[in-house]
């Protein structure tokens, strides 16, 4: 919400918008390109990049429409409440996504592995050991090394925890009316997120080139890249949201009492922090 809320009409009905449908189409193209890319299809990288560019363009115009409506004084307290509920349900849906992925990991480790290690399978594959990270029966998967918690995952954990602190400081500065401090701490939060993604990319290069850990490395490889990759996507989206918020802070769009765009992005970022803590423990330590 912006500083213009005091001018809001009693009731405002947003007009039709093409952006939700365009966002869905763009994300579909992105996922088609990504899925084909990991399967070695030659044209896949171009489709994936096209989809990403389309997503960015859609977000640019969609955010622009919302900002213009807010700055025009069209948003009332009821609209503000609807945004809060919408963001809450959106984050809840993301929680369900990660719950499904964590559930997959739990099933594979706690149910499937003991089943694979029972007496029947020992008779069929006498050299098979039912331990998490095992490559499976001989010849089914290339040998690889599992990813440990040091040093990159631990560094990334410290980076995200620190970013949560800097974002909280920025929010307190916003509520106190200190715009410069708000912008500085918010910029540091975005910078920490960018450094996190840089280390994540380096970790993937290390996994592929030195550990031979790939998406095709059995259930371990698929769950590892699914969980960490999906989380990395959320960090990227959170950094984009915070960048838009930083732009609006510098433009003076917010007041100490009306700044839900800031709060919504902060909710999302803290959610990303909490998910990473779960990943750090379950994926890298256990």
PLM regions and their residue ranges:
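...captures the hydrophobic TM-helix bundle architecture rather than a specific catalytic motif
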Residues: 1-286
